[in-house]
A protein has these predicted regions:
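Aspartyl protease catalytic core from the pepsin/retropepsin fold
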Residues: 12-39, 70-120
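Short helix/loop capping segments that flank catalytic or ligand/cofactor-binding pockets
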Residues: 43, 114, 135-136
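Hydrophobic residues embedded in beta-strands of well-ordered beta-sheets
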Residues: 42, 123-125
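A compact, surface-exposed functional segment
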Residues: 46-80
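Residue-level signature for short turns and capping positions that connect secondary-structure elements
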Residues: 49, 97, 111, 132-133
Length: 137
């Protein structure tokens, strides 16, 4: 996530990137995770999927736009993974994105779903443990 502040003729940017524990049916691993509210969905690099979870083929290939004008990336697989923030168990779907520059990215949909707050001043993540409690009504 990039948060910018204008100072004179330059911008100051803040990034939050933390190691998170990811857990799948095949194992678990800490991945350095970028929190990016500019990314719609959460993503994971293909190199880290094999030992975590079996990827599921998407019904239709998704073509994601990149920052390069006119450039797209084809995404064919998705995985569902559990992950921990401050010892709070959360879960979501991650697109398996070839050529991803990060190990994992938590996007806006996941941030909103779990009401994750980003504290740039203290470089920390805030998640209410109550959001992870399952309720059956």
């Amino acid at each position: 996530l990039l948060l910018s502040s204008f100072v004179g003729k330059c911008y100051l940017m803040s990034i939050i990137k933390h190691p998170l524990l990811y857990v799948g049916s095949k194992g678990e691993k800490y991945l350095y995770t970028l929190f990016d509210s500019g990314a719609n969905l959460s993503c994971i690099h293909p190199d880290f999927v094999e030992n975590l979870e079996t990827p599921v083929l998407l019904g239709r290939v998704r073509r994601l736009l990149t920052a390069s004008e006119g450039a797209t990336i084809e995404v064919k697989h998705v995985v569902r993974l559990d992950f921990y923030i401050n010892d709070v168990l959360l879960s979501d779907e991650f697109l398996v994105v070839p050529g991803l520059t990060e190990e994992a990215i938590i996007g806006a949909a996941t941030l909103q779903k779990w009401r994750i707050k980003l504290d740039f001043e203290h470089d920390r993540l805030i998640v209410d443990p109550k959001v992870s409690k399952m309720q059956i009504i």
